[in-house]
Design a protein with these regions (language model features):
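Tandem repeat domain/solenoid detector
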Residues: 98, 102-104, 134, 138
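Leucine-rich solenoid repeat scaffolds
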Residues: 138-165
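Intrinsically disordered, low-complexity regulatory segments in ankyrin-centric signaling systems
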Residues: 1-64
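Ankyrin repeat structural motif
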Residues: 16-24, 50-63, 89-97, 122-133, ...
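Ankyrin-repeat boundary/"N-cap" motif
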Residues: 2-9, 32-46, 71-80, 106-118, ...
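Ankyrin repeat A-helix N-terminal signature
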Residues: 10-15, 42-53, 83-89, 116-125, ...
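Eukaryotic tandem repeat interaction scaffolds
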Residues: 75-94
Length: 165
């Protein structure tokens, strides 16, 4: 019998890596929960509650056929990379980049992860902005509201985000 996504979420939180791997054999990796998240979207937000190492978990999802660039089926339609940036989760972010995540994937509003990195920048080290740009993120992709990451950086007055562009 196939597990539903809510059952797999509980498995992620309460079992070992081997048990998670076994559970994935009975799971449709392309399924979404009622909020529009696939298992990678869920993991990108809840990974600190899972015992297994981040690299191993993401590779396991890839091995079972997850599309690491898939966007949520509802809400803002963000990818796991968008979520990692918004949560400032360097662990997830770095692994997704190493595994080939598209730095220019657009969400339901046309925002790329770099737009989100500019938006959540708060005077910290600029890691997400700099890393995305160095990995080929385009600074000029216009979202559904006519704003690019570079334009957003120029408009933000409370932090000096312009310096990254």
């Amino acid at each position: 019998m196939k597990l539903n996504i809510d059952e797999l979420k509980l498995t992620l939180l309460n079992t070992s890596f081997g048990e998670i791997e076994a559970a994935l054999r009975n799971f449709d990796i392309a399924s979404f929960d009622r909020n529009g998240d696939n298992i990678l979207h869920y993991y990108a937000v809840a990974y600190k509650s899972v015992q297994a190492p981040v690299e191993n978990m993401i590779q396991l999802f890839i091995d079972f056929g997850i599309n690491i660039n898939a966007t949520q089926s509802k809400m803002a339609k963000r990818s796991a990379l968008h979520l990692a940036v918004l949560k400032k989760s360097k662990d997830i972010f770095d692994v997704l980049l190493r595994k080939g995540a598209d730095v220019n994937v657009q969400d339901g509003n046309g925002n790329v992860p770099l737009f989100n990195a500019v938006f959540v920048y708060s005077g910290d080290d600029g890691y997400f902005i700099e890393t995305l740009i160095s990995n080929g993120a385009r600074v000029d992709i216009i979202n559904n509201h006519g704003v690019s990451p570079k334009i957003l950086a120029e408009r933000i007055a409370n932090y000096d985000t312009r310096k990254f562009f």
